[in-house]
């Protein structure tokens, strides 16, 4: 006969302890730390809102549909993380930098590996009728020294607010994308289109969630950058168009004051706008 008094039964009050006690002694220490905290806060959430069976079923269905929306070009889980602010929080925790260094923001779900590498001054717009713009500036370290050989990976939406991978039958792959490398002076320059504001994909479960919360899905106009160099922390960031209507209500909380860039009209230039922006990279720890 089983001695029932020796069993550690699952109870509402002792749920956290019951689950965490099952963790094996050989569990990876970091995994143990993460899962112990996750169980603690997940159970606390369920107790705090007194989650119903119906609500839990809806949540499971939501996550299932979110998974079905993912493919090689679209990551609905990234969108979910973005709209609840988790992407920005994780990024903030992992990219603390000294004052004056360029700040990170969310990468977004539409970065594509393998974009063509161009000479400085090239135009990354393969097809489009948007407002033309020259993007330029320097890449320096925190002491003001130019960084030679910095890789600048850039991408943006079309004049209609869509990335190339969202319209494979309408835009050529790598439209409004390119890679550049700085010379000894740390300078960069390329041409493209002035970005426009756009809604994140809202035809899936994440868009439905925003609707239920009374939130719009729009992002302010921005150019994406990944700036990297040997010995320096990689910067994943945007430059935002100053004056955009959605700067104060970005659907993914990505706007930072230091990343808002002037887009200056250039009546005598070869493009309609000029968007100057300088990047400051922080040395890797130990460098």
Model-identified regions with their sequence ranges:
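Beta-strand-dominated extracellular/periplasmic modules and repeats
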Residues: 2-287
């Amino acid at each position: 006969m089983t001695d029932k008094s020796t069993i550690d039964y699952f109870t509402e009050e002792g749920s956290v302890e019951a689950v965490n006690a099952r963790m094996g002694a050989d569990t990876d220490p970091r995994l143990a730390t993460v899962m112990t905290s996750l169980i603690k806060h997940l159970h606390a959430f369920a107790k705090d809102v007194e989650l119903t069976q119906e609500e839990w079923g809806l949540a499971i269905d939501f996550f299932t549909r979110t998974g079905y929306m993912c493919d090689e070009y679209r990551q609905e889980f990234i969108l979910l993380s973005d709209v609840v602010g988790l992407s920005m929080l994780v990024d903030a925790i992992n990219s603390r930098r000294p004052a004056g260094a360029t700040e990170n923001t969310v990468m977004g779900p539409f970065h594509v590996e393998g974009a063509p590498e161009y000479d400085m001054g090239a135009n990354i717009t393969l097809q489009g009728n948007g407002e033309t713009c020259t993007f330029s500036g320097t890449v320096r370290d925190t002491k003001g020294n130019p960084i030679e050989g910095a890789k600048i990976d850039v991408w943006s939406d079309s004049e209609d607010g869509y990335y190339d991978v969202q319209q494979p039958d309408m835009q050529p792959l790598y439209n409004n994308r390119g890679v550049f490398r700085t010379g000894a002076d740390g300078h960069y320059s390329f041409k493209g289109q002035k970005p426009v504001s756009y809604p994140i994909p809202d035809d899936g479960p994440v868009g439905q969630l925003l609707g239920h919360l009374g939130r719009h899905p729009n992002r302010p106009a921005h150019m994406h950058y990944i700036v990297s160099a040997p010995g320096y922390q990689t910067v994943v960031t945007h430059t935002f168009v100053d004056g955009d209507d959605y700067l104060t209500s970005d659907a993914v909380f990505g706007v930072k004051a230091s990343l808002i860039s002037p887009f200056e009209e250039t009546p005598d230039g070869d493009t309609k706008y000029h968007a100057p922006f300088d990047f400051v990279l922080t040395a890797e720890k130990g460098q």
